[in-house]
Amino acid sequence: MYASRAYPHYLHLAVDFAGSHYSQMTPCENLRSDVEAALAANTELSTCAVQALLIYSIVLFSRDEIEDAHIAFGRCAEIALEIGMNRADFASSRHPENSVEAESLRRTWWELFVADVLMAIPLKTISFRCSAVSPEVPLPCEESLYTGNCELPEPRKVLEFKRRILLEEDVVFSSFSYRIEAATILGRVLVLNRLTDYHRDHLQAIENALVSWSNHLPMEKMEIVDPYGNMDEMMFQAHVIIAHASMLLHLPRSRFYPLLSSPQDDFMPYTHLHSSSASTRLVQSIKAMNASRRLSDYISLCPNIQKHTPFIIPALAMAGLTQLATSKNHSEECFDHHYNRVTLVLGCLKKMKRTWHLAEPAYHRVRSCAARLISDLMDKLNSEPLSKSAVLTQSTPRESEENNSPTGSRTSGCASSASARARPQFH
């Protein structure tokens, strides 16, 4: 394929380097040196250089080589902006007779946009490169169209997507479009968390955006798995990004934060803490808990964790930590619900760390936190009959009823009915 399409060798190497992490036969480190040397020797400013550097930077980030990843990504974004990939007509002018090639370039730009936000999560200072320019590039189409063998339709504009809220009927956009909006909201959360001072309205505006994202989803995009068991990976990632953004926003302002935060903790949200009332912290705790529960629900629907982007690793770690903190503030009746979700997260991280080193510290952080927070309660409940445990883990009537509602609005029986019982325990 590379020879027939005349792709440069450095792009071939970048793809091989990414794929080598899924194979036990290929020496990753040798390929890393090869692709690094090839990219360093390349002097052309081209879309292929952008694509190779984007792949390379994401792989480095997933290997927990954060500093090198940001250096590579910075060069990638610099080239993309210099050649004008952010312009509305860039892709179509490069490939006026080939809609698939033009779509590939639009997707490259928007993947840059999303990666720019996701790679900023562990940083203490943020300097977004791609979201600093006006959103001129048309939106990507649906995955099924892109991978098909037909001519692609005229791409839709970002303004069309934004104006959908003014229409009486739902207008369905591509799953990639909702993922882009999710990343935009996440970027707003990251910026807010790093402000030393802000008005309460700024926080409320982002809370409104998080809720509105779900409320404006058409029915076709509320679920991430269709009736035939096919998964929509773009919508899966979009839902995970929104859940992660919600945890990043609410957890630092909740009563859970003192239980989990520690110096130099890369997995907790970086923010300047502000004083708030006990009732406000309680509400923030419940919102963080619900976001972590939703994320674990998405993972349970799509359990083949190796098929998912390694960008979900920080979200998994935060979901596990939030569930652990919740278990300390809820009654023992709820413990099994939280324990099962923590077990799910640990299993996913354990499996992902075989491929991506970024999951290694995440796994050990959640595991060590679990050993500290719930080990004693596990010992206590282990002495009880198994039949009692089975009764406690049955769904409550509220849970059974709400599990039939759309994924985005489900609330577990523990998270709803038990939250009221647990409120006095938030002292």
For each of these PLM feature ranges, what is it?
Residues 1-9, 106, 116, 126-127, ...:
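Charge-rich, intrinsically disordered regulatory segments
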Residues 178-192, 323-326:
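Solvent-exposed, amphipathic alpha-helical segments
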Residues 282-332, 339:
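C-terminal hydrophobic structural anchor segments
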Residues 258, 263, 268-283, 287, ...:
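C-terminal, low-complexity intrinsically disordered regions in eukaryotic proteins
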Residues 108, 178, 206, 236-243, ...:
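Amphipathic alpha-helix face/heptad-repeat signature
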Residues 247, 320, 349:
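Hydrophobic, well-ordered secondary-structure elements that form the walls
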Residues 14, 51, 111, 181, ...:
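Residue register of alpha-helical TPR repeats
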Residues 1-173, 194-201, 208-231, 250-275, ...:
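Acidic, Ser/Thr-rich, low-complexity intrinsically disordered regions in fungal proteins
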